[in-house]
From Swiss-Prot:
Matches recorded under InterPro entries: Aminoglycoside_PTrfase, Homoserine_kinase_II, Kinase-like_dom_sf, Pseudomonas-type_ThrB
An individual GO BP term: threonine biosynthetic process
Organism listed in the record: Brucella canis (strain ATCC 23365 / NCTC 10854 / RM-666)
EC number: 2.7.1.39
Annotated keywords: Amino-acid biosynthesis, ATP-binding, Kinase, Nucleotide-binding, Threonine biosynthesis, Transferase
Protein name from the UniProt record: Homoserine kinase
Catalytic activity: L-homoserine + ATP = O-phospho-L-homoserine + ADP + H(+)
Entry similarity comment: Belongs to the pseudomonas-type ThrB family.
Keyword match Oxidoreductase: no
Enzyme class: transferase
Length: 326
């Protein structure tokens, strides 16, 4: 979450007249994040999050994102719920931006996730996949295999300035993924960006997921692969198999993986590492100093790519046989 668009109390008050959430008592910007402008609102009836959607978010996708949160909450998944305006809409206009209000989710994200946190996230992700199974809307993943080569081409010329040999490495990975990407695996709604800062905890208990603005329809096991990359590597870039086993155990306790999904996990994890390396690399090379966009080191994901190249089976990530459906 972040603040790119400033708002004043007068325009905020006018905006809030379209909602039945009580009287505004205070508001403040939330500094973390990169995509949209976010404010914490305190009113006489509770706390809420106000989001102003910036240029990186396609307005046409907002009904999918907000509708998904509404659907998941109705299915019992802990996540922010969109607050419906008095006119029945979920999206308004504030400071020249599309804007929405969602309920406040209690908890904190874990900067150093433990094994217990990883298991809870795996279990929660599986519950999300099951809860989203009957969500009627679809959204194409705009950052999946067919999109990686065009994105890479925007950075390719300068990639070796980040590390010598990165062009050859990335070309080889893309060639491999294009030849080996799995087909016919179970699909559904995925979060697609479930990093530690998008999962809240109260102690070791998962209190819910936030930031569904990359959610889409894609391979369910790809979401698991994203989480292995996001949750199970240490600061020294080593893979923590104990955390990986816990995450996979949590997931498969709710939704066992098929044999085909388990077999595909090394390719999916390698692809997820490439996806996040490419977006980081593009921002690293193109975002000017002083920009609001926080640049993240692409080399963290180059090291993950190198790790996944050595993996031959999901067992090496910690997947146990009882987690695979017969």
């Amino acid at each position: 979450m972040a603040v790119y668009t400033d708002i004043n109390e007068i325009e905020l008050g006018a905006f809030l007249r379209h909602y039945d959430i009580g009287t505004l008592t205070s508001y403040k910007g939330i500094a973390e994040g990169v995509e949209n402008s976010n404010y914490l609102l305190h009113t006489s009836s509770g706390s809420f999050i106000l989001t102003l959607y910036e240029k990186r978010t396609n307005r046409e996708d907002l009904p999918f994102f907000l509708g998904l949160m509404q659907h998941l909450a109705k299915r019992g998944l802990e996540c922010p719920q969109p607050v419906v305006r008095n006119d029945g809409a979920m999206i308004g206009q504030l400071a020249g931006r599309p804007a929405a209000i969602v309920t406040f989710l209690e908890g904190m994200w874990m900067r150093r996730p433990t094994v217990a946190h990883c298991e809870a996230v795996g279990e929660g992700l599986a519950h999300m996949h099951l809860a989203g199974a009957d969500f009627p809307m679809r959204r194409r993943n705009g950052l999946t295999l067919p999109d990686w080569r065009p994105l890479w081409n925007l950075s390719r010329k300068c990639a070796d300035t980040v590390e010598r040999g990165l062009v050859a490495e990335t070309e080889a990975d893309l060639d491999f993924l294009e030849k080996n990407w799995p087909a016919d695996l179970p699909q559904g709604v995925i979060h697609a960006d479930l990093f530690p800062d998008n999962a809240f905890f109260l102690g070791d208990r998962l209190s819910g997921f936030i930031d569904f603005y990359f959610a889409c329809t894609d391979i369910l096991a790809y979401d698991v692969a994203v989480c292995l990359n996001a949750w199970c590597f240490e600061k020294d870039f080593s893979y923590n198999r104990t955390k990986g086993a816990a995450l996979l155990r949590g997931y498969t306790s709710v939704r066992p993986l098929s044999e085909a999904e388990a077999d595909a996990l090394p390719v999916l994890a390698r692809g997820a590492a490439v996806r996040f390396m490419l977006t980081r690399l593009y921002d690293w090379l193109t975002v000017p100093a002083g920009s609001f966009v926080v640049k993240k080191d692409p080399m963290e994901y180059v090291r993950r790519m190198r790790f996944h190249r050595q993996i031959e089976s999901a067992a090496e990530y910690g997947l146990e046989m009882q987690g695979v459906a017969a």
